[in-house]
Curated annotation (Swiss-Prot):
Protein name per the record: tRNA-specific 2-thiouridylase MnmA
Function: Catalyzes the 2-thiolation of uridine at the wobble position (U34) of tRNA, leading to the formation of s(2)U34.
MF terms (GO), sorted A to Z: ATP binding; tRNA binding; tRNA-uridine 2-sulfurtransferase activity
Amino-acid positions noted as binding ATP in the UniProt annotation, renumbered to this chain: G12, M13, S14, G15, G16, V17, D18, S19, M38, G127
Keywords, in A-Z order: ATP-binding, Cytoplasm, Disulfide bond, Nucleotide-binding, RNA-binding, Transferase, tRNA processing, tRNA-binding
PANTHER family, alphabetized: MITOCHONDRIAL TRNA-SPECIFIC 2-THIOURIDYLASE 1, TRNA 5-METHYLAMINOMETHYL-2-THIOURIDYLATE -METHYLTRANSFERASE
Enzyme class: transferase
Classification via Pfam families: tRNA_Me_trans, tRNA_Me_trans_C, tRNA_Me_trans_M
Residue numbers annotated as active site: C103, C200
Length: 375
């Protein structure tokens, strides 16, 4: 068994408090820690501020404070080729992708992991709110973070056993408030820095405007299922299933209830809308999914198994039955109770209690075996 001082851990440092505390804790525990800042997008935010420069300066400050070397590595090409082109293709096809999941799978835990191994790392570490349990035989289990409100296993659900065996999550057992407290007590420069939001690496900006720079918007009609035109949309890519905001339709019609997106018709470039949060056309009983990835071999589960699932981040778990197709490349997921606004392109993530089993990308939603006109 190596002494901790001989175990090199390369920490992905974003300039935020979570990765700062991750690096600090590992250093305190005696590991050989190296900080690496990933540069994956070359741009300014909507305020004209180059946040990449600011973030790297924060990494430099924290690394100096805790006494570790730090570097910046450019993964712009990998991000564009492996994540952003997929992101754009999904939007072109009327779907709503989750770039953070693909970003973790292809950049943070693949391109970055490969780089870390090239500089003799034993592990990489990230500031994610997730936990790992390691069996005696070396197998790794991905567990929810201790902070229910911050748990990020949803975004890590496409990671493989091989990837996770080389990973540490130093703050996964902590509450966010504890992470802030540790940062403040250690005097870290990022202790009071606000959490980042927005698309992985791209940051906070007007999303429709940003998307329009790469995909020209094609306006069309907003129509009810009865064929009544209610107005015009600004391009199907700007809307997602269950969306209310931005439709610009008053509460007219049969009731005074607000209007929601209930589907998209790509052939006619039509946005389908309906009234009421609990509109029956927003509820599905099942879905099918592909691009499956499981953390560990689940062949002993047979052709079907029961577990819980999430269909979007921070959503309450729903009981489901998962049925594999013949070659186990796709699954049918049947819900214990109807679920609102199942969205093609998003991820269905499977759980067994606290353990994240893996996930698949949602292709279609169904109500009583009838395909819902979501795309």
């Amino acid at each position: 068994m190596k002494d901790k001082s001989q175990i090199r851990v390369v920490v992905g440092m974003s300039g935020g408090v979570d990765s700062s505390v991750s690096a600090y804790l590992l250093k305190q525990q005696g590991y050989d820690v190296v900080g690496v800042f990933m540069k994956n997008w070359d741009d300014k935010n909507d305020s004209g501020v180059c946040t990449v420069t600011e973030d790297y300066q924060d990494v430099a400050k924290v690394a100096s404070q805790i006494g570790i070397p730090y570097y910046s590595v450019n993964f712009e090409k990998e991000y564009w080729d492996r994540v952003f082109t997929y992101f754009l293709d999904e939007y072109k096809n009327g779907r709503t992708p989750n770039p953070d999941i693909m970003c973790n799978k292809e950049v943070k835990f693949k391109a970055f992991l490969d780089y870390a191994m090239s500089i003799d790392a034993d592990y990489i570490a990230m500031g994610h709110y997730a936990q790992l349990r390691r069996d005696e035989d070396g197998r790794v289990h991905l567990l929810r973070g201790a902070d229910d409100n911050k748990d990020q296993t949803y975004f890590l659900s496409q990671l493989s056993q091989e990837q996770l065996q080389k990973v540490m999550f130093p703050i996964g057992h902590l509450q966010k408030s504890e992470v802030r407290r540790i940062a403040e007590e250690a005097g870290l420069a990022t202790a009071k820095k606000k959490d980042s939001t927005g698309i992985c690496f791209i940051g906070e900006r007007n999303f429709s405007k940003f998307l329009g720079e790469f995909l020209p918007a094609q306006p069309g009609e907003m129509v009810t299922l009865d064929g009544e035109v209610k107005g015009n949309h600004f391009g199907l890519m700007n809307y997602t299933i269950g969306q209310r905001k931005g439709l610009g339709i008053g509460g007219d019609g049969k009731s005074n209830e607000p209007w929601f997106v209930i589907g998209k018709d790509l052939k006619t470039n039509t946005l389908l809308v309906g009234q009421g949060y609990h509109n029956e056309h927003l509820y599905a009983n099942s879905l099918d999914a592909s691009k499956l990835s499981f953390v560990d071999d689940i062949s002993d589960c047979g052709d079907e198994f029961h577990c819980t699932a999430k269909f979007r981040y921070r959503q309450k778990d729903t009981g489901v039955t998962v049925k594999f197709n013949e070659d186990r490349t796709k699954v049918e997921v049947i819900f214990d109770e109807p679920v609102r606004a199942i969205t093609p392109g998003q991820e269905v993530v499977f759980y067994d209690g606290e353990e994240c089993l893996g996930s698949g990308t949602i292709d279609h939603a169904y109500k009583e075996s009838k395909l819902l006109q979501y795309v």
